[in-house]
Amino acid sequence: MIAEHAICPDSYHPAVARDGLLTRLRIPGGVLNVAQCVAIEQLLATTGLDYIQVTNRANLQLRALTKDLDRDVLTALTDCGLAANDRAVDGIRNIMLSPTAGIDLQELIDVRSLAAAWHDYLTDRSELGILSTKFSVGFDGGGSVGIVDRPNDITLLAVNDREFELYLSIGNRGSAPIPVDVRLGVDECLPMLAAISQTYRYGIELLGRTARRKPRLRDVIEHWGLTGFSEIVRRELAGSSRFIFKNLDEQRGAGSGERGTELKNHTLNRDNNDHLGIHQQSQPDRYYLGIVLPLGRWNRSQVKGLGEIAEGYGSGAIRLTPWQNIILSDIKSADLERVQLLITELGLIHTANHPSSLLRACAGSSGCQFGATDTQRDAIDLSNYLAANFTLDHLGGALRVRPLSIHFSGCDKSCAQHDRADITLWGDERTRSYRLAIGGITDRSEPDQSVLAPPAVPIAIGNLIAAYHHQRHPQESFESFTTRQSPVQLHQILHAV
């Protein structure tokens, strides 16, 4: 065995889970090429696994491994760029891009070269291997499919065609990073990221002596305070006086200025399905196609098939999204119909109106020691029920609803989706059932009436969606509809016969 088992795994250091070993492959920028798809297909064949999963960081993970990846497999992964040559830094290559970087009609800055430069910086510095393997940096080019609301430690958001706004993770676990009143030119971004990562390293060396777990960036910032943290960063930058971090969200709460207005107009894509389906690119006569992977699962034949489609009809690129879906890009208009047919033949969905596009679920009791319920199975059961009984189409159809988000969590950690969903089902260890939260409101009309046994979930959620369709006011959001229902009314809706 060559690997030590880890809490947060990478290619070289798997984690022990209830269903076996868990390994994650970092995909910097979330973009795969055809050769990497071939390597993934071979990896699935070698390990005997049915599928690989796209994660909510736009990486890939393998579950239920019976042993560590051997040397030959790791060599194949490093040869094609799916693993780092230096095992010390493999796990910190969490680099998230806007999934439509370089092809988005509304994009302000193409962030791909900047992200590539950051990856080169990380992989050349073994000393940064001390950072948490959850450490992540996001690059948002200001296009229609944004990632500024994803819970990265650092995010750079393009605010015009020359500058980025710096965001840092300061809040609670799973919270989106916040602006810190620093604007950077393109050439200033890499030095700033380097200074922050080195300052984070110093903090780990200090706090890690007594910490029970490796400190996250937010822990280091909390220890020194935002001002103190920025002072150390400034020293790393040779004392640039204009880089003083401030909690800009707090300042905007008192009154917003021009900068706040500019950022307010940026499209946030929380649980956004807008990238699914066919979309025109910034390049003439080129389109991208967003494809649903139910619960992020991507089986061997689909890996092979999408790789062949990307090579034959696109530019060879397959883009992973933090919503656990896939984008095929650079397709000619004349080939769209054929590509859609090929995708359908692979058993995949390329529209935003399928129930599978609404669902997020953690590993649950089948794969995690903390899971109280089998979230994967229960989410699939709900998806099948909704698909058989409803047409979930936000553009029209038998049941017209805006895309909702439904989150199954086996415990209170919310690993699959850190931010609030429209409907959340929390695994309850005492009852092995689900506690239900709807738009932030829990059905508490009587003790334990907020608890749903797994077999009751599909009908209850179906009742709620149907009630929203039939009883809502014109243009009323799901959250507004559920907020104006009393606990008794919600209970009656959920448990209607």
Report each predicted region and the residues it spans:
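Terminal amphipathic helices with adjacent charged low-complexity linkers/tails
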Residues: 68-69, 205-250, 269-278, 334-339
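Short, C-terminally biased terminal segments at protein or domain edges
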Residues: 250-268
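Intrinsic, low-complexity N-terminal interaction/targeting segments
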Residues: 2-16, 82-83, 274-277
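Long hydrophobic segments that form regular secondary structure
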Residues: 283-287, 297-318, 461, 467, ...
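Active-site cores of enzymes that catalyze phosphoryl transfer or operate on phosphate-rich substrates
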Residues: 267-292, 297
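Mobile "lid/hinge" segments at catalytic clefts and subdomain interfaces of large enzymes
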Residues: 131, 135-223, 419-470, 474
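Gly-rich Lys/Arg/Thr-decorated short loops/hinges at beta-loop-alpha junctions or inter-strand turns
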Residues: 17-24, 174-176, 283-290
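Small-residue-enriched alpha-helical segments and adjacent helix-cap loops
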Residues: 20-165, 191, 289-431
